[in-house]
């Protein structure tokens, strides 16, 4: 059996799926969605960090996140 590692806790991922209408959620489904969320968050974070650096800052601000979301 493959060991699946994700950074996000799976309980909130399951809650999101249930809120979206799922009555039951497999462990694999939780892990797969968590991996997708992490990947998207990394893309946003990298873009936001680039924007902060371009602005001459080391600190990522909320406006960097908002702009990164619009650009992705």
UniProtKB/Swiss-Prot annotation:
Q: Tell me the organism.
A: Archaeoglobus fulgidus (strain ATCC 49558 / DSM 4304 / JCM 9628 / NBRC 100126 / VC-16)
Source taxon at top rank: Archaea
Q: Name the Pfam families on file.
A: CBFD_NFYB_HMF
Write out the GO cellular component annotations: chromosome; cytoplasm
Q: What does this protein do?
A: Binds and compact DNA (95 to 150 base pairs) to form nucleosome-like structures that contain positive DNA supercoils. Increases the resistance of DNA to thermal denaturation (in vitro).
On assembly, the entry states: Homodimer or heterodimer with another histone. Dimers then assemble into higher oligomers, with the DNA wrapped around the protein core.
Keywords from UniProt, A to Z, are: Chromosome, Cytoplasm, DNA-binding
Gene3D superfamilies of this UniProt entry? Histone, subunit A
Q: Which segments carry the region annotation Interaction with DNA?
A: 24-26, 58-61
A single GO molecular function, which one?
protein heterodimerization activity
Family membership noted in the UniProt record: Belongs to the archaeal histone HMF family.
Recorded protein name is Probable archaeal histone A1-1
What InterPro entries does this protein map onto? Archaeal_histone_HMF, CBFA_NFYB_domain, Histone-fold, HmfB-like
Q: Where in the cell is it found?
A: Cytoplasm; Chromosome
């Amino acid at each position: 059996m493959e060991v699946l590692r994700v950074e996000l806790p799976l309980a909130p991922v399951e809650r999101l799926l249930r809120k979206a209408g799922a009555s039951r959620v497999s462990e694999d489904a939780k892990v797969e969605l968590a991996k997708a969320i992490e990947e998207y968050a990394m893309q946003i974070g990298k873009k936001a960090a680039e924007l902060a650096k371009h602005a001459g800052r080391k600190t990522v601000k909320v406006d960097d996140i908002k702009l990164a979301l619009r650009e992705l």
